[in-house]
């Protein structure tokens, strides 16, 4: 028995919506409490001092201050903090 898909069908005809991930506020920028600093999948960058982490791993400011990106800790991880 011959196996052939119905004419006109395709497996590739779709595209996902953009997710707008990435850094929203850069190092040295002044931010207010609640400002989103970084949207990401997983914790590529970890929250430091005065930074919170949402359920989708979005990092946001807990206090007003200046954004600071740095590397540190025992595992040499990337962090973002807010300097008041």
Swiss-Prot record:
InterPro entries given in the database record:
Ribosomal_bL27 (IPR001684), Ribosomal_bL27_CS (IPR018261)
Keyword Glycoprotein in annotation: no
**Molecular function terms in GO for this entry?**
structural constituent of ribosome
Ordered alphabetically, the record's keywords are:
Ribonucleoprotein, Ribosomal protein
Enumerate the residue ranges of region (Disordered). Answer: 1-20
Report which superkingdom the organism of origin falls in.
Answer: Bacteria
SUPFAM superfamilies reported in the protein's UniProt record:
Ribosomal L27 protein-like
Q: Please give a single GO biological process term from the UniProt record.
A: translation
Ribonucleoprotein keyword on record: yes
Q: Which GO terms describe its cellular component?
A: cytosolic large ribosomal subunit
Xref: PANTHER family: LARGE RIBOSOMAL SUBUNIT PROTEIN BL27M (PTHR15893:SF0), RIBOSOMAL PROTEIN L27 (PTHR15893)
The family note in this entry says: Belongs to the bacterial ribosomal protein bL27 family.
Name the chain's protein.
Large ribosomal subunit protein bL27
Q: Which organism is it from?
A: Francisella philomiragia subsp. philomiragia (strain ATCC 25017 / CCUG 19701 / FSC 153 / O#319-036)
